[in-house]
């Protein structure tokens, strides 16, 4: 298949996620897609959003009752399904499902007047006042059932279901694919620091020392304009110590994506600062995003999309714990609660929530993405919590559970992996392409009610070692 082949476009999400031989992605549309779009079910637990050839859909996730998987038919090795799987996956990753709910007051940021007033007053409001205003805005967040808190894997589980259908249609016991992480690592973790205020700038050297004491390198995102002056010497220090420099918004005023023309003007300046800083990555202020506009950016990866956005001003979430491409930009989703949320919204100085998220993500081989602000993390209680997190991450690395990487390293790996191919035939599969020396051939198979992954020869384990996913088809 070539990239413009309609059949490949239909099956693109599955092929790109697993990097498996394209012959195993043999899905076709059953019927014609009906006008309109909405929510439906893909099995008893999963929610999808988009069009279907059945015409059944709901306006909200809670009202979704039609299970499209009941209407799958198989002819030969082809599965005929009543939806476009790549479109459904894109609708979740790019948060297009939020559009219909905004009409009901869900998923939008505060009104322009309220938000303008808040940002005008923000420099004069301490955290103690801001957190109470934010708690008022977030009231009732726990009633939202979709995306699933504290970690949502809807995209990953949809693709696992499709892979299971493919195995049954092809009558094979396993399907080869390129393992998600280099050198056979079970999962991945990145640590990032958004620098919000001048006090955070001053705290960067101390935070680097804390990170280094656990043998961990991280990335620092700096705001180029208005908030504070970015000392060139600090950028040089960050890079010299093996940490990473990235761009954090333009001026963090909350208006980056308000108007297309103004956004393009700002994007040009953001691209300029990315070149000046030697930065490959970006994160917008307050995790604002509009993924359909990312073609204006020149950076390599973005880190602005939460896995679950219930506790952010812009609600939504990408519903995956894996990196994914938005055009040429790689998205590294924020998959764990931010420190500000933990300390000031939940008033929690334990790492219990982080531990829950770590367990859910690592047992499903995903990306652990943490954002800890220098502005909030050096007060004693916060510092103690943060060092407990670092100790846990260091332990996971020693145990071989995570690849502790810089964001730019994940970006480079994921791009290499996307260019690799599996060639050969059953029993003689091989990986070809750039970076293949770090890649591991893996196999997905159905083991009872679970998808099971086995490695050909993972690092640090005997051949045939098994790792299990929590997917139940």
Task: Please describe what each predicted stretch is.
Residues 320-321, 327:
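Eukaryotic tandem repeat interaction scaffolds
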Residues 260-264, 318-320, 417-425:
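Short, surface-exposed amphipathic charged segments that create phosphate/polyanion-binding patches used
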Residues 186-191, 199-201, 208-315, 327-343, ...:
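Metal-dependent polysaccharide deacetylase catalytic core of the NodB/CE4 family, i.e.
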Residues 1-221, 225-229, 296-297, 328-473:
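Terminal accessory/targeting
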């Amino acid at each position: 298949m070539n990239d413009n082949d309609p059949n490949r476009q239909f099956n693109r999400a599955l092929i790109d996620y697993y990097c498996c031989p394209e012959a195993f992605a043999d899905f076709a549309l059953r019927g014609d897609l009906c006008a309109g779009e909405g929510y439906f079910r893909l099995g008893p637990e999963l929610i999808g959003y988009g069009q279907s050839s059945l015409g059944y859909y709901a306006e909200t996730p809670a009202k979704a009752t039609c299970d499209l998987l009941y209407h799958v038919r198989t002819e030969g090795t082809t599965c005929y399904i009543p939806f476009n799987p790549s479109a459904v996956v894109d609708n979740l990753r790019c948060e297009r499902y939020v559009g219909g709910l905004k009409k009901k007051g869900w998923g939008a940021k505060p009104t322009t007047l309220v938000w303008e007033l808040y940002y005008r007053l923000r420099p004069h409001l301490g955290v103690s006042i801001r957190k109470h205003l934010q708690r008022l805005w977030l009231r009732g967040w726990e009633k939202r059932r979709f995306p699933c808190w504290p970690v949502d894997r809807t995209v990953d589980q949809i693709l696992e279901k499709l892979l299971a259908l493919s195995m049954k249609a092809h009558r094979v016991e396993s399907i080869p694919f390129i393992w998600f992480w280099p050198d056979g690592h079970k999962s991945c973790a990145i640590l990032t620091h958004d620098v919000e205020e001048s006090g955070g700038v001053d705290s960067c050297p101390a935070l680097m020392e804390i990170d280094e004491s656990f043998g961990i390198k991280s990335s620092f995102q700096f705001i180029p304009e208005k908030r504070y002056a970015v000392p060139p010497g600090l950028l040089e220090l960050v890079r010299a110590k093996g940490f990473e420099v990235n761009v954090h918004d333009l001026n963090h005023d909350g208006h980056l994506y308000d108007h297309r023309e103004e956004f393009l003007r700002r994007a040009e300046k953001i691209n300029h600062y990315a070149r000046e800083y030697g930065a490959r990555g970006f994160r917008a202020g307050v995790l604002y995003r509009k993924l359909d506009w990312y073609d204006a950016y020149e950076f390599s990866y973005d880190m602005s999309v939460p896995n679950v956005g219930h506790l952010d001003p812009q609600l939504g979430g990408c519903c995956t714990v894996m990196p994914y491409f938005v055009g040429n930009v790689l998205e590294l989703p924020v998959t764990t609660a931010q420190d500000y949320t933990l300390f000031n919204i939940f008033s929690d100085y334990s790492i219990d929530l982080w531990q829950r998220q770590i367990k859910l993500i690592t047992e499903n081989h995903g990306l652990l993405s943490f954002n800890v602000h220098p502005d909030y993390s050096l007060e004693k209680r916060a510092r103690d919590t943060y060092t407990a997190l670092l100790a846990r991450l260091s332990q996971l690395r020693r145990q071989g559970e995570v690849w502790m990487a810089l964001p730019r390293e994940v970006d480079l790996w994921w791009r290499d992996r996307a260019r690799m191919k599996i060639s050969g035939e059953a029993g003689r599969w091989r990986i070809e392409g750039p970076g293949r020396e770090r890649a591991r051939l893996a196999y997905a198979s159905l083991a009872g009610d679970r998808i099971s992954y086995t490695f050909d020869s993972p690092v640090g384990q005997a051949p045939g070692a098994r790792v299990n996913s929590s997917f139940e088809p």
